[in-house]
Amino acid sequence: LVVPDKMSREKIFHLRALGATVLLTRSDVNKGHPAYYQDYARRLADETPGAFYIDQFNNDANPLAHATSTAPELYQQLEGDIDAIVVGVGSGGTLGGLQAWFAEHSPKTEFILADPAGSILADQVDTGRYGETGSWLVEGIGEDFIPPLARLEGVHTAYRVSDREAFHTARQLLQVEGVLAGSSTGTLLSAALRYCRAQSRPKRVVTFACDSGNKYLSKMFNDDWMRQQGLIARPEQGDLSDFIALRHDEGATVTAAPDDTLAAVFTRMRLYDISQLPVLEDGRVVGIVDEWDLIRHVQGDRQRFSLPVSEAMSRHVETLDKRAPESELQAILDRGLVAVIADNTRFLGLVTRSDVLTAWRNRVAQ
């Protein structure tokens, strides 16, 4: 199965658990590039004896499934009275299939496109033309080309929805209605709400919860990930604490104690996919232990994993008060070190080069 690399790890792990071989391709290239997921999949099928390329973007069975099942189900459940249907477009099968059926059975029904900001499809609906493709984090909808199955000419109105609006709407859907849905659902619901608010009389409007939010727990429903993407933010403090990605007072920093064993520290490193931990005693940082410290002290002797962290940690810790100038932080990072940020002696968190770059990027995005 060929999958763009921006897809959530839950989707990828799920597919592998089912026995699929998952091949990741670049999501930063457009159609026609050899690393684009559709071009890669077609080439792989051509080169593999006995392979079958399903190609949902050009397979007539795709819209047919929606014309024969989704459309009549919606029509029956709403007793034949649907004013508008809000859809997203990935392969185009949902929109194309629904339009084909409703054109015959309910021609009054309008089709509304919910499109991620950065996709070209809303431009095509509005003007019949499109320019450069942008980028977006929402998964499963939005395109950098016009899917032939989509029948965009039948779309009444298109709404562009930013990642920020989509993710916040999906999170609100969970908080208010108890529905745990995926990222594209946030895009569709945002567009549906905008459409409804623009009407002058009540209408019966349909949209979809396209996927379970279980596939997005590491991304859209993870506050740390949302902050790293600049989609939610803490109040600015105007000091070095603004650069901390994982704050200790929020329980986000993984730490060690001086009397922890090296085995326990190594287990934490693997569990949280990190390479270094601050060592705390009475709320103060007394050292840092990283993978190289473990290598130097274990030296292939598994019995040495029982050594305490205090024997392996580096005691040379670069600590900055949160009120220090940014130039002092940069000087520490220039030496390839990680900076410990404190409020007087109280540990707040670590700052790495990546944390600084993320903070700077998010400032520009705002």
Over which residues does each language-model region extend?
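Glycine-rich beta-alpha junction loops
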Residues: 58-61, 90-93, 115-120, 129, ...
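Short glycine/serine/threonine-rich phosphate/pyrophosphate-binding segments
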Residues: 7-12, 88-99, 121-122, 184-192
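The conserved cystathionine-beta-synthase
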Residues: 254-273, 279-281, 298, 318-337, ...
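Active-site/ligand-binding loops adjacent to catalytic centers
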Residues: 38, 103-181, 220-244, 252-256
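Bateman (tandem CBS) regulatory domains
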Residues: 154, 238-253, 260, 305-317
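Glycine-rich acetyl-CoA-binding "A-motif" of GNAT/NAT acetyltransferases
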Residues: 285-288, 326, 347-350
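Active-site/ligand-binding-proximal alpha/beta "capping" segment
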Residues: 48-92, 97-101, 149-152, 156, ...
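Active-site-proximal loop->helix
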Residues: 1-44, 117, 121-129, 146-148, ...
